[in-house]
Amino acid sequence: MAKLRVHELARELNMTNKVLLDKLQAMDLPTPVRSHMSSLDDDVVALVKASLVRPKAKSVVEKRIGTTVIRRRKKVVKPAEGGPEETAKPEEGAEEGVQEMDAAQESVSAPEAEKAPEPVAEKAPEPQKAAPAAEEPKAEEGAPAPEKAAPVQAKEEPEEAPQAEAKPAPPKKVDVTPPGDKAKIIAKPEPPQPAEPEPPKEEPAPVELPEEKQAVSAKAADTPAEPQEEPEAKPEIKAEAKAEEGAPEKPAEEPKAKEEQKAAPEDSKEEPKAEEPAQPAEDEKAEEKAKAPEEKEPAKSQEPQAAKEPSKEAPKPKGKKKKKKETAAKIISLPTRPVEPVVPPASRQKPAPQSPAGPGGPGGPGVPPQPRAPQDLGGDPAAKKEKRKKKGRRDGGTTEETDSKFFKKKISFRKKAVVEGADLYDKTPGKLRKGKKGGKAQPVRQQKTQTTTPKAIKRRIKIDEAIAVADLAKRLGIKAAELIKNLMGMGIMATVNQMLDYDTAVLLAAEFGYEVEKANFEEETVLKAEEDAPETLSNRPPVVTIMGHVDHGKTSLLDAIRESNVTGGEAGGITQHIGAYLVDSPRGRIAFLDTPGHEAFTAMRARGAQVTDIVILVVAADDGVMPQTVEAVNHSKAAGVPIIVAVNKMDKEGADPDRVMRELSDHGLVPEDWGGDTIFVQVSAKQRQGLDDLLEMVLLQAEVLELQANPDKLARGHVVEAKVDPGRGPVATVLIQEGTLHAGDVVVCGIHYGKVRAMYNEKRQPLDAAGPACPAEILGLSGVPMAGDEIIAVDDEKVAKQVSSHRAQKQRATELAKSSKLSLDNLFDQMQAGNVKDLNLIIKADVQGSIEALRESLEKLSGDEVKIHVVHAATGTVLESDVALAAVSNAIIVAFNVRPSPKVSDMAAEEHVDIRFYDIIYNAINEIKDAIVGLMESTYKEHVSGRAEVRDTFTIPKVGTIAGCYVTDGKVERHNQVRLLRDGVVIFDGKLSSLRRFKDDVKEVATGYECGMGIENFNDIKIGDVLELYYLEEIKPVLK
């Protein structure tokens, strides 16, 4: 067999390397062992196993060094050599009995009268510690002991049980047990009983229990105790009685070892409780005694009771009631109910748990079985009352029935009930739990509320045009973090307060199983348009819009019709505002709308086409069809409005009406002379020719259209233009389409509302009422409406305010949703366009239409390099707040037809804010273009001017290396950039520091001449290098 190492042997013997090394070094081995890697021969391994596996006997030497201190020392007794291990085991019981008698005799002389009432059955006796196999705990547990207390047995039962079953039962050792050990049973003797006798009732003992116990114990010490005469108050006696009933019950009772461990200290205290029921304060002390270390208890249990009796006098127990010494006599009272006879295990009462039977132990061969708990001996009513008082105390001892109830309660608290989802909401009776004392019922604690899916009708929510993330999460009943996570999955970076548009909210709600509906304010109900009865309708004047290209004579034509001079008041001779006029002709009234012809006023032309009945398209006979002419044609066709073409400037030389007809026919306007349906009228606004024919055609077309309206109802119309008048506040030019607007009516106009305080016509004359197709200026609105907003008269101002606030909220939420919606794609684009410059503008204009035209025209100028951002736009003069905003946002203020006050001008100068004033939109657009070009970076183009070859180098102190060169191509100029090439590779790129020919500085050197050149901050010039000279040409950007 191969040699074994120390660590392998330690693994076989189930011990650590260090412990085995210590044991090996203590043994006299032929070969010294130094570490766990040392090798051992076969004979050494056998010797070590024989010495270590065979347990050594121990004896405990005790010496009392004080009234309460006992010193114990273990004395190892080497077993006889050559004795086999198997033969030593049967002798252990007898050897233990002898050592128990010796140890008991040593402790007889120790006076410990006070310790007599201690719960002797709780602690282990000393003879167990003096067993021969006490060196190793596991070997000691397997060794049988003559008499063991209940707590120690309960701790060792799980290990004792298998060994006790495996070993053959040795002969009974009842006679071997000395009388001194039996004297430890402190209780009154009873007549002999069978295995489960029913004892007679016993009267409670007087308070001086310790003295009586001492007398009984002394009496028992003088005479050998018989097993059948042992009282039932001792738990060990009960265990013996149970074991005598039959050995087959022993394995069934072994699994209850842990229950005995908890219950044995309580059961052992039951009889003393009955004898002294008047001391409830000692229960806690008894529990402390039960938890004391085991080393102190054997000495108490071994002391002979006869020796303790003389040391105690009658008044002593009363004087020492408050100390821990007498706690064992005051734990619990004896039960008064009669004990039921022992029944089979299938009956209601469970058999008392027993300690496992082993050689020399309770219930084993040689020792009568000991019952687990004392029998019910009855008691007086006072004892019953005291028992009821202390029934619920944890630290007090209880009867077997009380113990079982306590453990059942404990188990019931740990029990977990499975509650179905439907039971959580089931409020039917019968789900209540009674209290500890049978009081009022307590409701069972419900589990956490489960998340349930609402019904389909509840999974439908209504939202406005936009909703915040937090509000949507609240509506859906989920956390906002879940919504944000889903938004990130959709590529949208959102916060809790960010606004979401309707479409995004629909997608999010669908993921959580909800349907979304638009919760529009019931404007349709409040502002419902009523259909007019035919008998209430009457003819109304036509609304005619004059459209055409710029400088084709639209306003001049209208002036000729109105016999006014509007053109003279226009800046630059062009119309920049939309105007509404009511003209009286011999055949009736006509409402005219004059629109600007400049390309910037597209929105104005579109608005005019929407509210008009007939469009007069003015085309100059000498100029023909222009881009804005085509645009006006498209607007009119989109609105479904008939067009009358007025060929103007027929008095000028070069007028060609046929050319106009040809070009317009290409756009779908075929004249009547050519078989079409478009009316062409040749006029001259300057000479006032053809005006009557034009008005006649307009009225004829109106008759064909049968224009009618109901004047006897609340007015409805559209805002043609709006502005802020310094003295009158917000002023809106409106065109009434149906109904009649009176002064004092409450109106809603876009997001604003108000009461009409005054009305004026185009000549600034006050009006009391404005009927259908009548333009008017109204005052009294809460703000400046947008051009094109619908104006509606209502009955109640409260309704108007409600509609206005709802519209304002919806508009604000929509703007927030657009501005704050940041997606991953947009973020990437912004990162890519990090070098894009922004030109911030603040637009202040006289009317809303001009602002609209300026904003659209300027934002079209944005390019890839410069973005135009309109920070703020409003009507009215430049205010201090505008200057402050411009200073913060680094913006330029564009003032169109407005002027600031001197105070504002001074503030702008202090804040270094640039204010630009314009009265013609052309100039504003051109200057903004120049500003954009100035912000754009120029490009540079490289031009090679010449090449020179280095033929020699010179080093000049404080100057550096000078290259003597020969110009081979082109010419060399002083301001050129130079590039040094060596073998075709660029070595350096910089500037010329000097250029000389001989000793003279020169500006340039032509081809075929030699010169000296110095390169700035570079001296590594070698013969054979080539110097390439070039210059950069700046190419300024051009705005497309």
Swiss-Prot record:
It holds the Pfam family EF-G_D2. Residues 539-706 form the tr-type G domain. It is found in: Cytoplasm. Residues 573-577 are annotated as: G2. Residues 548-555 are annotated as: G1. Residues 430-439 have a biased composition (Basic residues). Residues 112-126, 198-214, 231-300, 394-403 have a biased composition (Basic and acidic residues). The keyword Protein biosynthesis applies. Residues 444-454 have a biased composition (Polar residues). The keyword Protein biosynthesis applies. Residues 142-153 have a biased composition (Low complexity). Residues 73-403, 427-456 are annotated as: Disordered. Its main location: cytoplasm. Residues 684-686 are annotated as: G5. Gene3D superfamilies: 1.10.10.2480, P-loop containing nucleotide triphosphate hydrolases, Translation factors, Translation initiation factor IF- 2, domain 3. One of the essential components for the initiation of protein synthesis. Protects formylmethionyl-tRNA from spontaneous hydrolysis and promotes its binding to the 30S ribosomal subunits. Also involved in the hydrolysis of GTP during the formation of the 70S ribosomal complex. This is Translation initiation factor IF-2. It comes from Desulfatibacillum aliphaticivorans. The gene is infB.
